[in-house]
């Protein structure tokens, strides 16, 4: 049994001196059996308006500046460093005790674009997304792996969005980069047609990108909740770097990833992308990805996707 982190839900822990470190959000704890108490203590400190782990260290846990930002955003707080040298990273991943002021985040307007990678067969989902988020984003662009006629037919149904077409040709990163170039907005949320941002993520988008701009970030990793045949799977948090500045680029034909210095990226753990999957499609995808690139099939991912979610642990 591997216990899940009480901040991000990850179950992969690293040994670091006398601590266990979450390999995702950077939380360090003395005893994994105290994770619930640790998260309550973190929230209490954030609610107090100041977290100074140098002057007032916690006994059971610690966070460095980057880790504190991860935790703060997860629980709906914005943070500002107590002391900052101009030109340095505001929240560095340096294992020093975090020191920051905290305030409750508030919904802010934004001019984020929504980019959708799609196949011609996904027309019904595209129309649903276009209607559901018509007023939630500055613009919506679909990049269709299809023909000009298919793109034109789709555009006629939803004329308030832009529909372009280009063959995927087995290269997910290249297709995402094309979509990045088409958006003409500073920040872009990219989704696939089987994904939907939940209400909490939609409400947070404005303050997230404003905070990211202050902190010099270009790529934000979102959690993805995989719903296989309608049931949440054990594959969580399944981080996806989908909220990005338009100048950020992806690499990797399969399982594409952002090309960005680590200090310019962060987790954004508030809300989630809901990902609807069919169990048979999960099995088929493993075979398809492996055929596209050796090792990309990741059978361990399939096993997690087909196992039920347990909020406490991966068993």
Q: Model segments located where?
A:
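Catalytic-site signature of metal-activated, phosphate-bearing donor transferases
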Residues: 2-99, 173-180, 197-315
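Structural motif
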Residues: 117-121, 143-146, 167-168, 192-193
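Generic signature of mature, soluble extracytoplasmic domains
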Residues: 118-123, 127, 147, 173, ...
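Acidic donor-binding segment of Leloir-type glycosyltransferases
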Residues: 129-169
